[in-house]
């Protein structure tokens, strides 16, 4: 999953910075994952801590629900922001670090064990961007 917050230096803040200057976005990635709001993760952790049994430790995965490509993620940021910028797919290989092509997490265990409904990434992104404005 791809974690973002209101702090700088994450995918959302980088896209917002580019569109604030009127730049178009070029995405060369074929990566798929689940964009995840750090606020949702923090709220989840605080809500499940009292429910944990300290004698039995489990490993849980969490991300906002739904899966998208980085291209789709950038498009959604632009749409919610009502920007005139465009997203273009760039097939050129990046010089940056190789990333996994599929990094979505299975959240069924945490959802079932703690009886939680996980917010969809689009809804959470909209909440996040509205909070920034």
Predicted regions and their residues:
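NAD(P)-dependent short-chain dehydrogenase/reductase
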Residues: 1-33, 38-47
């Amino acid at each position: 999953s791809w974690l973002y917050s209101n702090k700088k230096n994450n995918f959302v803040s980088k896209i917002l910075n580019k569109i604030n200057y009127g730049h178009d976005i070029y995405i060369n990635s074929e990566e798929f994952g689940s964009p995840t709001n750090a606020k949702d993760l923090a709220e989840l952790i605080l809500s499940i801590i009292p429910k944990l049994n300290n004698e039995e430790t489990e490993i849980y995965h969490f991300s906002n629900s739904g899966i998208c490509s980085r291209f789709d993620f950038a498009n959604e940021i632009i749409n919610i922001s009502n920007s005139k910028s465009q997203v273009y797919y760039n097939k050129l290989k990046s010089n940056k670090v190789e990333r996994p092509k599929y990094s979505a997490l299975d959240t069924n265990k945490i959802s079932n064990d703690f009886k939680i409904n996980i917010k969809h990434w689009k809804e959470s992104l909209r909440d996040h961007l509205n909070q920034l404005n």
